[in-house]
């Protein structure tokens, strides 16, 4: 009886603290996050179809948000008449956005980005703005033009956070590699300067079957090739993709936000935002993870929760993501379409949740 009572009070304490025990399981047995670090969802802050010239009339998703010179910039994938391109919206308060249209164009026929030039991640080195974006020569048929494998990392640069962006076809950061853990996808991610080198937390996946994870790439020159880790940073069975990092100075802890791919009735889809935490940028324990946002605490998207991007604003951490108010989930590839962009918040400082023994 004492054990039951003490366990009950531990559970109540976790709920009050923003943590909770999670019991959801997946039909194929893929790992789950056993605890929660619940963000407070604000709802949709950017609707697809708001961009000029139909640039996002079929969807707005895969966001990358950053601050520069007192303004906020949001790169997002706009699903337009000819395919998906990285588009720009700007804001002063993270809640009201002005859509400005595409910032990249399709490459010429035969180029690695001839079918899509999307998901534009950025890094400012103090002089130049560097963009690492996702390119692919393959998509599904019209009208959706959903990017298909291989997912490649490509390079552009600019003199300001709003561009214009000049593609650097002469620079090949890295590519997919046959018979490796990144045979299908080696797409861009968050960059951290660590001592005399840069670390990129890139998205990696096999092509068949598709196993997804985050891994490390290293370089000392942003305009040179990167060296990819021989082994993934986290197990591919985690089924995660995309990265956005935040460093909590109060406890010297790194928090890596990512989206998880779940499965229901045989359909894989992005079902949650997870966060991992570590004191070491190069070592991450798959046990140290929690659910941040899913259908349980999202106000409007009851199934799909995709690709996080985090940015600090005062004493809160803003978490951008994409979702869909469709219910049930659209069948097949249609689950990728008609996304909108939402915003959720976590209070700072962040504290790593504590796993309670069963």
Task: Name what the model sees in each region.
Residues 21-358:
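Carbohydrate-active catalytic/glycan-binding domains of CAZyme proteins
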Residues 8-18:
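Bacterial N-terminal signal peptides
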Residues 1-4:
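Positively charged n-region of N-terminal signal peptides that target proteins for export
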């Amino acid at each position: 009886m004492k054990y039951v009572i003490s366990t009950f009070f531990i559970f109540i304490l976790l709920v009050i603290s923003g943590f909770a025990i999670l019991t959801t399981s997946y039909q194929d047995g893929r790992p789950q996050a056993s605890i929660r670090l619940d963000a407070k969802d604000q709802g949709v802050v950017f609707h697809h179809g708001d961009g000029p010239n139909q640039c996002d009339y079929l969807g707005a998703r895969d966001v990358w948000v950053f601050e520069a010179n007192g303004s906020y910039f949001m790169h997002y994938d706009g699903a337009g008449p000819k395919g998906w391109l990285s588009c720009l919206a700007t804001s002063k308060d993270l809640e009201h956005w002005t859509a400005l249209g595409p910032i990249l164009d399709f490459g010429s026929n035969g180029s690695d980005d001839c079918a899509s030039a999307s998901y534009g991640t950025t890094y400012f080195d103090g002089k130049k703005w560097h963009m690492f974006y996702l390119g692919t020569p393959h998509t599904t048929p019209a009208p959706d033009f959903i990017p298909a494998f291989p997912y490649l990392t490509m390079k552009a640069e600019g003199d300001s956070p709003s561009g214009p962006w000049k593609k650097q076809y002469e620079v090949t950061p890295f590519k997919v590699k046959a018979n490796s853990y990144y045979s299908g996808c080696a797409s861009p991610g968050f960059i951290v300067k660590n001592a005399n080198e840069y670390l990129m937390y890139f998205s990696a996946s096999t092509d068949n079957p598709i196993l997804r994870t985050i891994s490390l790439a290293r370089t000392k020159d942003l305009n040179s090739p990167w060296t990819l880790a021989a082994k993934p940073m986290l197990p591919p069975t985690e089924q995660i993709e995309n990265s956005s990092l935040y460093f909590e100075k109060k406890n010297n802890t790194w928090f890596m936000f990512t989206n998880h791919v779940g499965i229901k009735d045989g359909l894989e889809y992005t079902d949650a935002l997870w966060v991992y935490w570590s004191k070491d940028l190069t070592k991450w324990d798959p046990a140290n993870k929690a659910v941040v946002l899913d259908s349980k605490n999202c106000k409007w998207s009851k199934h799909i929760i995709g690709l996080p991007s985090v940015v600090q604003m005062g004493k809160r951490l803003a978490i951008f993501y994409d979702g869909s108010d469709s219910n049930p989930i659209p069948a097949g590839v249609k689950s990728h379409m008609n996304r909108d962009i939402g915003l959720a918040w976590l209070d700072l400082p962040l504290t790593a949740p504590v796993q309670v023994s069963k």
